């Protein structure tokens, strides 16, 4: 009897922990969407399709598998001056930096973009964002 | 009870008048008006201009004669509203792809950086060609004066602004006779829908 209760208790804790992370992830997705529309959609478009050969797409791209997430976080924060390859095509219009975006903003943005366009729809945690930004080239 | 009878011909007449009125919807003439010597109204007109386009060719009011065109002000390194404006202009470019009576005229407000080569590269990446869509550069003071006085939009340098320039995201619709017939917010899709409707209307004039 006690055993059964203990197992049940552990299960409940397990579920609630998991859903707490999921709740955070979903909050990040919602906040990230607002941030995306304010800071990114002008060029990359609301649907992530990019603008012709001028600005690269984010949706349906190899970016999510090919480029490290920490590297993308740094590009968002500090901009991109060099040419970047997306789906085998070079894009060389410079991307402006976003100095106003803090680690939390970038965690939310990355989580939102992952949710929409990456096969890996997991949270990009605040810790990951902090760590990435601290180690930008 | 007395019955009121309206003859059918009267109904048809009223119907035709209403229909006629609707068809006569005309776009306004914008800008300061003057009274001519004969007491007629002289509408605001875009003066003569001459700029270089992305193919190193001169573009002037002569190239716009008999055409309607959409004018805007931008710069290629603009991080804020220009990409939005270009997205919307591309819609217009595609919509009137088969119509030689329509032109787009985009003036750079950063002519020092946006030379012919930069504009050519930009045009190539947007997959657009002249003369349907001219990206033009010239003397900065000429561009700013034309923007402010003739197209009635703000365009100036401002070190405090992101990208170094302040400018409005306006699209200006100019008719076949160099009159301004509409000003729209080029960053808003609904406003540009309105512009496209007005262009269709203007082409019928």
Task: Label each region the model flagged.
Chain A
Residues 17-35:
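Electrostatic cytochrome c docking/interface patches
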Residues 2-8:
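Sec-dependent signal peptide recognition
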Residues 72-81:
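Solvent-exposed helix-loop boundary motif
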Residues 10-18:
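Hydrophobic h-region of N-terminal signal peptides that target proteins for export
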Residues 53-59, 81-134:
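Axial heme c-ligation environment in periplasmic c-type cytochrome domains
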Residues 32-46, 95, 109-113:
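The canonical Cys-X-X-Cys-His
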Residues 20, 46-49:
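Cys/His-rich metal-chelating microdomains
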Residues 50-70:
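N-terminal, post-signal-peptide region of Sec/Tat-exported proteins
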């Amino acid at each position: 009897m006690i055993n059964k209760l203990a197992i049940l208790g552990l299960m409940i804790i397990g579920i609630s922990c998991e859903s707490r992370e999921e709740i955070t992830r979903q909050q990040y997705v919602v906040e990230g969407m607002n941030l995306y529309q304010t800071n990114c959609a002008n060029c990359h478009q609301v649907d992530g399709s990019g603008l012709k050969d001028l600005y690269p797409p984010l949706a349906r791209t190899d970016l999510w598998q090919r480029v490290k997430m920490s590297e993308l976080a740094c590009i968002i924060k500090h901009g991109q001056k060099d040419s970047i390859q997306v789906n085998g095509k070079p894009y060389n219009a410079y991307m402006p930096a976003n100095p106003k975006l803090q680690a939390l903003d970038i965690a939310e943005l990355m989580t939102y973009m992952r949710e929409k366009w990456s096969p890996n729809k997991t949270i990009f945690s605040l810790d990951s964002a902090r760590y990435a930004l601290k180690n930008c080239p | 009870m007395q019955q009121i009878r309206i003859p059918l011909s009267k109904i048809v007449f009223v119907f035709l008048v209403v229909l006629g009125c609707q068809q006569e919807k005309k776009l306004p003439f914008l800008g300061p008006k003057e009274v001519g010597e004969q007491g007629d109204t002289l509408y605001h007109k875009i003066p003569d201009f001459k700029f270089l386009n992305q193919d190193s060719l001169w573009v002037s009011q002569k190239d716009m004669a008999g055409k309607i065109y959409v004018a805007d002000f931008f710069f290629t390194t603009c991080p804020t509203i220009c990409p939005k404006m270009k997205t919307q202009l591309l819609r217009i470019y595609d919509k009137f792809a088969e119509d030689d009576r329509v032109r787009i005229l985009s003036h750079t407000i950063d002519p020092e950086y946006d030379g012919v080569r930069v504009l050519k590269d930009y045009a190539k990446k947007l997959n657009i060609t002249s003369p349907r869509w001219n990206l033009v550069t010239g003397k900065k003071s000429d561009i700013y004066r034309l923007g402010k006085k003739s197209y009635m939009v703000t365009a100036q340098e401002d070190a405090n602004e992101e990208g170094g320039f302040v400018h409005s995201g306006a699209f200006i619709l100019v008719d076949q006779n160099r009159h301004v017939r509409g000003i729209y917010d080029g960053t808003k899709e609904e406003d540009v829908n309105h512009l496209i409707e007005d262009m269709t209307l203007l082409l019928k004039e």
